[in-house]
């Protein structure tokens, strides 16, 4: 964590202290064809019309906008103010360890303004709590039979995004698309799974999923046609949100072994049944998501013979979050997986009568008239 303090303007020492809070980390997500080391390479930012964006990676505006805003307040001499503190926490995107590690009493301010938002003209007055579901399948190897063809099944071109901010946009999930194809292909053509690598980060909507499957030589053409037909159906269903969805099926090297059929079947059904996306909208604030979940990761490990999946559940109502967690646990435990929870943190309940909210609304209204 980083804490920066700025003394009050002379004569304003008796005013209430203000804490400007943000976080230093970002969601480091990139396209599979982009060569980028987030620990060493700078973000390739460029201007596209009225927007600053990045080339093949996330930009880091979450929470770069908030951090830069707080630093601007610190560096200007044009604002009269009481004591100001800037609190920039670490690992907000991966469990809030920085915030959780903050000792009581370290911050001296009376008012805290959270700068972790990026929508002009909007004030954030609450936030969902979250919890991770860590899912583990153990599997055995089955020898690859004779008379089959190995095919890569790649889902790319989806928008992805932050699983909290972008979840109301109803974007597709590449893992869900992959298993939608696999489920139909197994039922109709007996297609078997050798390996799967879906998603990249626990708090990002999966934009890509890659796998290797095998199919009887005689059924190859039918499977390929089926995969592209399902892909076209998904593109039609998500025409407004996923216009660039791509499905690639092409021959590859035959694997030595497959994930055992029973595990494949049960896991596939669990992924199909797993809740995903917006679960419930708020009854009190129109347009606000109350409860949501995102199937973020699903990856096989051939060396350890395991398949790990991860869901991040969010809700501003703790009891609803716990209910959703138990639903997801039930789905995967019925399929034979082990499910554990981690990283639970509470929500920030909105207070529509907050005097700070009224002040912020008045300050915004003066120059903009709205």
Give the role of each language-model region.
Residues 12-94, 99-110, 132, 147-150, ...:
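Active-site metal-coordination/substrate-binding segment of hydrolases
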Residues 6, 155, 213-217, 311-315:
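Short beta-strand-to-loop capping motifs
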Residues 13-14, 217-226, 318-324:
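Short, conserved charged micro-motifs
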Residues 250-294, 302, 318, 322-323, ...:
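An extended, acidic, His-containing surface patch that forms the Zn2+-binding/catalytic region
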Residues 84-174, 182, 186:
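Fold-level recognition of mixed alpha/beta catalytic cores in primary-metabolism enzymes, strongest
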Residues 126, 143-148, 167-197, 217-292, ...:
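Acidic-enriched catalytic cores of C-N bond-cleaving enzymes acting on peptides and small amides
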Residues 300, 306-325:
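C-terminal catalytic subdomain
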């Amino acid at each position: 964590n980083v804490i920066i303090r700025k003394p009050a303007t002379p004569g304003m020492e008796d005013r209430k202290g203000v804490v400007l809070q943000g976080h230093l980390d970002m969601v480091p997500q990139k396209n599979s064809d982009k060569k980028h080391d987030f620990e060493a390479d700078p973000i390739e930012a460029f201007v596209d019309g009225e927007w600053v964006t990045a080339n093949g990676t996330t930009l880091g505006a979450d929470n770069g906008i908030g951090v830069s805003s707080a630093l601007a307040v610190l560096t200007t001499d044009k604002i009269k103010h009481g004591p100001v503190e800037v609190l920039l926490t670490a690992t907000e995107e991966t469990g809030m360890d920085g915030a959780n590690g903050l000792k009581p009493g370290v911050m001296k301010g009376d008012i805290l303004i959270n700068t972790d938002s990026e929508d002009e003209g909007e004030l954030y007055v609450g936030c969902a709590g979250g919890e991770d579901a860590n899912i583990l399948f153990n599997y055995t190897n089955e020898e690859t039979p004779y008379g089959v063809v190995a095919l890569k099944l790649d889902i790319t071109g989806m928008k992805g995004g932050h699983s909290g901010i972008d979840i109301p946009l109803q974007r597709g999930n590449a893992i869900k698309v992959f298993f939608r194809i696999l489920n139909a292909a197994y039922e109709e053509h007996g297609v078997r799974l050798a390996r799967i690598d879906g998603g990249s980060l626990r708090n990002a909507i999966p934009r890509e999923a890659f796998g290797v499957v095998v199919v009887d030589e005689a059924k190859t053409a039918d499977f390929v046609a089926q995969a592209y037909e399902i892909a076209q159906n998904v593109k039609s269903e998500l025409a407004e949100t996923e216009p660039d969805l791509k499905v690639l099926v092409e021959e590859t090297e035959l694997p030595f072994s497959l994930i055992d059929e029973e595990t494949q079947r049960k896991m596939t059904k669990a992924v199909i049944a797993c809740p995903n996306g917006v679960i419930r909208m708020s009854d009190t604030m129109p347009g606000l998501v109350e409860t949501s979940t995102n199937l973020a990761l699903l990856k096989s490990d051939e060396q350890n013979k395991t398949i790990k999946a991860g869901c991040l559940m969010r809700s501003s109502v703790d009891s609803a979050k716990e209910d959703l967690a138990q639903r997801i646990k039930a789905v995967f435990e019925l399929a034979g997986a082990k499910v554990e929870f981690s990283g639970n943190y509470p929500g920030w309940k909105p207070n529509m009568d907050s005097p700070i909210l009224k002040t912020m609304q008045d300050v915004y209204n003066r120059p903009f008239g709205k």
